[in-house]
Amino acid sequence: MDLVRQLNDRLLFAVPKKGRLYEKSVALLNGADILFHRSHRLDIALSTSTPVALIFLPAADIPTFVGEGRCDLGITGVDQVRESGVNVELLQDLDFGRCQLQVQVPAGGPYSQPEQLIGKTIVTSFTRLAREYFARLEGVDEAAMTTRVKYVGGSVEAACALGVADAIVDLVESGETMRAAGLTPIGTVLSTSAHLICSPNPKSSLALLDTVRARIEGVLAAQHYVYCTYNAHADALPALLRITPGRRAPTISKLDDDNWYAVSSMIIRREKGRILDDLKASGAEDIMVFEISNCRV
C-alpha cells in the first residue's frame, strides 16, 4: 500500500518489461537522469532522481495503458500502437527498435506478390494490421474479405512449414530468423520503431511532462552529435566555418596571437570522419572531438 500511495504525485511512465526494447529504454532513461532501482519481484519502480514512477509492462499492453490515461507516458513500437487501435500521441521517434512488419512466404514457393495471397490463410500476432492490409488488397471491407487471418502468439515463422498457413505477417529486423525458416518477404505492412508516446488525457502536470520529454530529446540529440574544436588562422577561417557551421552558429574565440582563432562547433556524428578530413585539408590545426553525454537543443 505504501508503494501505491507514492504513485499519486508521480508521472507514470510505462516501459517495456523485457527484451531489447527494455534494455534500450533503460539506457535512455539513465541518460536522461531518470534513475531507479527495480526489485526483481515488482513491475513498478520509483525514480530516485525525479518524481516519476516506472511501470514495466509487455510492449503490446503499453498503448492501452497510456491511451486510457492509466499511464502518462510510454515507450513502445509504432506497430503495437497501430495494432492496439488506441488513441495516443506519438511524441518522439527514439531511433531504436527499427524493423519491418512484413508478409513472408516460403522461399521458392508459388507466391511472389502479396495479391496472390488473397483468399489464402495468413498467420500472425498482428491480426488488426494484417486484416487491414489484406482488406485493402482485396478492395473490400474487412467483413467481406476472403483472406483468412489467424492469430498465433509466438513462433509465427513455423506456421508455413507446419502447414498452418500459406504466409505469415511478422516483425523482421535483420531477416536472419526468417531466412533460417526458409521464408522470404514479398510485402511490407508497416515500418516501425520505438517511440515515446503520451496519453491524450495525462494526469501528470504538463510542466513535468515537458521536462521528461526535453531530457529524452537531449539524450537523442547527444547521440547524433559530437563536439569539435580546432584552431584556425584568420586567412583560413571563412573556409573552415563553412565546414563546421554548427547547429546555429560556431563559437569563435580570439587567441593571444592576433592571427589565430579557436573554433568550437557541434557536428553530426556520422559525418565526423569526413569533416575532420576536410578541416585538416583546409588548414585547421589542433583538431579535437569530444563526446556529448547530454544536451538541450
Swiss-Prot record:
Location of the protein in the cell: Cytoplasm
- Protein name as it appears in the record: ATP phosphoribosyltransferase
Q: Which GO-annotated molecular functions does the record name?
A: ATP binding; ATP phosphoribosyltransferase activity; magnesium ion binding
Keyword Cell cycle on entry: no
Q: Identify the EC number(s).
A: 2.4.2.17
* GO-annotated biological processes: L-histidine biosynthetic process
Q: What is the reaction catalyzed?
A: 1-(5-phospho-beta-D-ribosyl)-ATP + diphosphate = 5-phospho-alpha-D-ribose 1-diphosphate + ATP
Cellular component per GO?
cytoplasm
User: What is the originating organism of this protein?
Assistant: Eremothecium gossypii (strain ATCC 10895 / CBS 109.51 / FGSC 9923 / NRRL Y-1056) (Yeast)
Similarity comment: family membership: Belongs to the ATP phosphoribosyltransferase family.
Please give the superkingdom of this protein's source.
Eukaryota
Which keywords accompany this UniProt record? Amino-acid biosynthesis, ATP-binding, Cytoplasm, Glycosyltransferase, Histidine biosynthesis, Nucleotide-binding, Transferase
Role of this protein: Catalyzes the condensation of ATP and 5-phosphoribose 1-diphosphate to form N'-(5'-phosphoribosyl)-ATP (PR-ATP). Has a crucial role in the pathway because the rate of histidine biosynthesis seems to be controlled primarily by regulation of the enzymatic activity.
Pathway as given in its UniProt record:
Amino-acid biosynthesis; L-histidine biosynthesis; L-histidine from 5-phospho-alpha-D-ribose 1-diphosphate: step 1/9
Keyword Secreted assigned: no
